Amino acid sequence: EKTDKVDARMIAEYAFRHQDKIKPYNPQTESIQELRFWLKTHDALKESRKSLINLSRSMKHVPRTLQKSIDELTEQLKRTDKKIKELLKEDQELASNAKLAMSVPGISYVTTAAILVDTRNFTRFTDARKYANHTGCVPHKHSSGTSVYRRPHVSKASNRYINSLLTEGSVSLMTHNKEMREYADKKRREGKSNGCIINNIRNKTLHRLFAVIRNNRIFEKNYRCELKKEHHDVLIHHNALFE
């Protein structure tokens, strides 16, 4: 028998049996929706400008109309950048966490905006370990017995946009941040691959980010947040998988 009444009962029974796994729906606020709009606009303008610049480099003589289009996109991109920064600084809902996030080395204002949108201002995700998995910063093992083994790899179903932003930040840290540059040099001497090093730095960055949000405290170089033991153990485990 299949009726609306029977279906409703089955759904209710299923929900009751699995109530420990229920995640309440968390709708996007107006601030998050506006930030998402300007972030998408920023990315669209950036990609369009990049395409035209690449096109111009393949020409001996750049047409005036093409250069004009590049200049217009550059100006639009500047205005969009300004709008995103204003939202992060002045919006009552976003400003506090945005300030904390941007204090972490490797987290730019664009990365901050993207993570605020993706986590819905750190309400959709509150745990660095889970978010690292969501963004493809956690290697997964694939083995069975003694005959099946693949090198640990990150999930292809991850949020690649956030992953790419974290990668950009990690590469920048390896060049400009003394602590991370020394860390990268040490790992290279140990024979670690560049991908492994970048992934470890992405993980470190995310754990620092969620720590400052959790503790409501600006990141300080010489301050070590008291991470929960399970978070610390998981980070060590993640690093060990890639090493």
Q: Where are the regions a protein language model picked out?
A:
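Long, charge-rich intrinsically disordered scaffolds of nucleic-acid metabolism proteins
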Residues: 1-104
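Short, residue-level hotspots on alpha-helical faces of the histone-fold
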Residues: 13, 117, 164, 168, ...
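Non-catalytic alpha-helical coupling and interface elements of nucleotide-dependent molecular machines
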Residues: 16-20, 50, 54, 136-140, ...
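Hydrophobic (often cysteine-bearing) scaffold residues that line and stabilize catalytic clefts
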Residues: 41, 76, 158, 162, ...
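Phosphate-backbone recognition surface of nucleic-acid-processing proteins
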Residues: 103, 109, 114-190, 194, ...
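Acidic, carboxylate-rich catalytic segments that either coordinate divalent cations
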Residues: 175-243
